[in-house]
Amino acid sequence: MPARQSFTDLKNLVLCDIGNTHIHFAQNYQLFSSAKEDLKRLGIQKEIFYISVNEENEKALLNCYPNAKNIAGFFHLETDYIGLGIDRQMACLAVNNGVVVDAGSAITIDLVKEGKHLGGCILPGLAQYIHAYKKSAKILEQPFKTLDSLEILPKNTRDAVNYGMILSVISCIQHLAKNQKIYLCGGDAKYLSAFLPHSVCKERLVFDGMEIALKKAGILECK
Amino acid sequence: MPARQSFTDLKNLVLCDIGNTHIHFAQNYQLFSSAKEDLKRLGIQKEIFYISVNEENEKALLNCYPNAKNIAGFFHLETDYIGLGIDRQMACLAVNNGVVVDAGSAITIDLVKEGKHLGGCILPGLAQYIHAYKKSAKILEQPFKTLDSLEILPKNTRDAVNYGMILSVISCIQHLAKNQKIYLCGGDAKYLSAFLPHSVCKERLVFDGMEIALKKAGILECK
């Protein structure tokens, strides 16, 4: 590996997680997101270290910030899973024992035991369920309704659709988690977390993993 | 109510359940289905009693068999649910205590206690999940794969998608059922039943409900 610049503090660099819809950044402890069209406007001066699951958005980042560095090769997550997304790998790297849920445009559920990734499964993103309901029957294309609780059984179509979607996602996570701690990240983390007693929202989970990876690679100094 | 012909035996009439995709029939103890284009070819001679959730398919039936009778008005299911599909009502009418799952182009899950419908929820049909996955990310549009068990955690994208879909449906049903008996009908009933220990497949469930309704209305003689 070539000699690389080393940073004494997270403050001196910018972390970037390139997703399928948005591009997420962590600058020190500030989090912000951008569409690929707005990247230039961000005017980032510091060195960018990134991961990406979307080639097109990655190109857009490199177009604006040609020195940004992909850190996918700088770390290793122990797993037998073939094709595990780099964002899922980073989130799992930040958890030693527990269940990692990334609830974004898809919902990924991964199990980690003593730092080893044991496997995981994928559900559609909450906003994407509408397409499956619409194809099931026209009347099932219902507007999203936030639920306060799953205690009361639905008594109309709109509630029945929203309840089914949330209960199936929640009970799937709980079935896999059993009594383990649940770590949630992604846009729907906060909403889902309210239904999961043993869970914590960790907005920075992917960035926490990136920080660990940079430390292991010696790019960021361990304090 | 006008005087109606009374039948001594189920053998003397044909039951019909008009769905969104197919039109299902029960002739004595034989079950068969038809697309609306093929109805004429069936050449049914006996009197038809039907329920319908699809206006277009209903018109097609009446076009071929103008004497067919809609029995929706002939019965009552105790419920506070507004807009409960007539097929769900009929399936629930056939169960006194338990959970009724109709796994077709949508998956409906309904709870019945001492003959009263307590409420229920709706999930997309298994075949319809593909549309939600596709919208979540292109790579998640995976072909359906039948799973033998949910014991082994997925270690690739195709398994992760199929496992997530099945586990979320199964764990949702189990969460609602607790220790109650689960009655499954619809095209995917047999497949789902294999993952649900306290379940029975009842292919005729909707027709059993229709038979009860006809008996209560005095159209079919009680033996």
Swiss-Prot record, chains A, B:
Record keywords: ATP-binding, Coenzyme A biosynthesis, Cytoplasm, Kinase, Metal-binding, Nucleotide-binding, Potassium, Transferase
One Gene Ontology molecular-function label: pantothenate kinase activity
What's a single GO CC term here? cytoplasm
**Which EC number(s) are documented for this chain?**
2.7.1.33
Key word Transport present in the record?
no
Q: How is the cofactor bound?
A: A monovalent cation. Ammonium or potassium.
Q: Which residues bind K(+)?
A: 102
Listed HAMAP family = Pantothen_kinase_3
Q: How does it assemble?
A: Homodimer.
What is the protein's name according to its record?
Answer: Type III pantothenate kinase
